[in-house]
């Protein structure tokens, strides 16, 4: 997840929302859910972020395989949750997610091993030298990835290592180890995560084809140059359907731009996925805003359809009731496929219709 705005450079792309489409209920089959439709076309998963809580409606939607056959732990596997003190591991939350995946027959996208945020102070402020920090990183990856060896279909190994201009973000890992921290992390993940697990680099604001997207391509080439396993690039896709206070004027790109960005990575031999998708706007919702949002969701889905190695799409939650966005951007939200009362929105219909409309290749 990210809390950054889209840079002014995105305006140079001249991207705007396409004319909203009327996704009438007569134009698609309501007898399928999202995951059912997606897997019937030969693709791997439609997923959602999971926080286990006492809400039987939300949890019931996630438990069913109709709409979601994959889950991503929203916070339970992050460093501050799993190793809050050095070599003192706490797995209750992460184990609960893994048990949920087993019980309800879900794929599990595990998130995330090395990230500058939600990192305990003992790591970020420890003043460790290069050798010690690498040892700490290996121990963390060994214990966390090793605990869920081959249970995770994917691991976001390194998360958000880039600035908006494509340069490396200042972090304890980069400042101490240099760019080599990235292939080193992937080497440890390759060693401990299990041969069945796909290893990903994950970041936000890649979708616009800007310098940051090229930075992620550079990371991919870097890891490959070390001869280390890297299987995919995750595009978080925290997007908007209109210009908002937080986006600096950018909106969800057109299908061709999105498709071209995905191909930046698949042309280098890896797969891609949208990993944290939501599409916000300035609230309150209106019919026009909901239609524009539906069209934006459809563009994202269509771009994934266009690229055979785009294996899946994860939305960052089920209902607007629990979305992270209003807590960070108070005038924005309504970004998910179900509203706060768990009614399916036009965006749900647009995603389902778009999936059902493409022919399996």
UniProtKB/Swiss-Prot annotation:
Temperature dependence: Optimum temperature is 70 degrees Celsius.
Protein known as: Endo-1,4-beta-xylanase 2
Superkingdom as given in the UniProt entry: Eukaryota
Organism: Aureobasidium pullulans (Black yeast)
Active-site annotation: 160 (proton donor), 276 (nucleophile)
Pathway(s) per entry: Glycan degradation; xylan degradation
Enzyme Commission number, as recorded: 3.2.1.8
PANTHER family according to UniProt: ENDO-1,4-BETA-XYLANASE (PTHR31490:SF35), GLYCOSYL HYDROLASE (PTHR31490)
A GO MF label: endo-1,4-beta-xylanase activity
Family named by the database record: Belongs to the glycosyl hydrolase 10 (cellulase F) family.
Signal sequence interval, chain numbering: 1-26
SMART domains from the UniProt entry: Glyco_10 (SM00633)
Function, as annotated: Endo-1,4-beta-xylanase involved in the hydrolysis of xylan, a major structural heterogeneous polysaccharide found in plant biomass representing the second most abundant polysaccharide in the biosphere, after cellulose. Hydrolyzes birch-wood xylan, with a similar activity toward oat-spelt xylan. Also shows weak activities toward pNP-beta-D-cellobioside and pNP-beta-D-xylopyranoside, but no detectable activity toward carboxymethyl cellulose and pNP-beta-L-arabinofuranoside.-.
Reaction equations catalysed: Endohydrolysis of (1->4)-beta-D-xylosidic linkages in xylans
GO biological process: xylan catabolic process
Record gene name: xynII
Keyword check for Glycoprotein: yes
Keywords: Carbohydrate metabolism, Disulfide bond, Glycoprotein, Glycosidase, Hydrolase, Polysaccharide degradation, Secreted, Signal, Xylan degradation
Residue span, GH10 domain: 46-354
Keyword Secreted: yes
Residues that carry a glycan: 88, 130
């Amino acid at each position: 997840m990210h809390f950054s705005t889209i840079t002014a450079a995105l305006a140079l792309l001249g991207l705007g929302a396409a004319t909203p489409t009327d996704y009438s209920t007569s134009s698609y089959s309501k007898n399928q859910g999202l995951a059912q439709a997606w897997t019937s076309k030969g693709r791997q998963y439609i997923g959602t972020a999971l926080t286990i809580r006492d809400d039987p409606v939300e949890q019931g939607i996630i438990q069913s395989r109709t709409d979601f056959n994959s889950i991503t732990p929203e916070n339970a596997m992050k460093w501050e949750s799993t190793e809050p003190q050095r070599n003192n591991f706490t797995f209750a939350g992460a184990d609960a997610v893994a048990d949920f995946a087993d019980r309800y027959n879900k794929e599990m996208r595990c998130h995330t091993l090395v990230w500058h945020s939600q990192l305990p102070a003992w790591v970020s402020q420890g003043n460790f030298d290069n050798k010690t920090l690498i040892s700490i990183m290996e121990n963390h990856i060994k214990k966390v990835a090793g605990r869920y060896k081959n249970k995770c279909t994917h691991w976001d190994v390194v998360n958000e290592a880039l600035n908006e201009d494509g340069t490396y973000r200042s972090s304890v890992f980069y400042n101490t180890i240099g760019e080599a921290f990235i292939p080193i992390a992937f080497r440890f993940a390759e060693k401990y995560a299990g041969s069945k697990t796909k290893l990903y680099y994950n970041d936000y604001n890649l979708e616009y084809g800007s310098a940051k997207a090229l930075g992620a391509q550079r990371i991919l080439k870097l890891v490959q140059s070390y001869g280390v396993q890297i299987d995919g690039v995750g595009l978080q896709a925290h997007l908007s359907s209109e210009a908002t206070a937080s986006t600096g004027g950018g909106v969800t790109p057109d299908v061709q731009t999105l498709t071209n960005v995905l191909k930046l990575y698949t042309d280098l031999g890896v797969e891609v996925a949208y990993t944290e998708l939501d599409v916000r706007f300035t609230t309150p919702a209106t019919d026009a805003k909901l239609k524009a949002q539906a069209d934006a969701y459809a563009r994202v889905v269509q771009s994934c359809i266009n690229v055979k190695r785009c294996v899946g799409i994860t939305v960052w939650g089920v209902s607007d009731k629990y979305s992270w966005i209003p807590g960070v951007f108070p005038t924005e939200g309504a970004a998910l496929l179900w509203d706060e009362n768990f009614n399916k929105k036009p965006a749900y219909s647009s995603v389902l219709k778009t999936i059902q409309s493409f022919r399996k290749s």
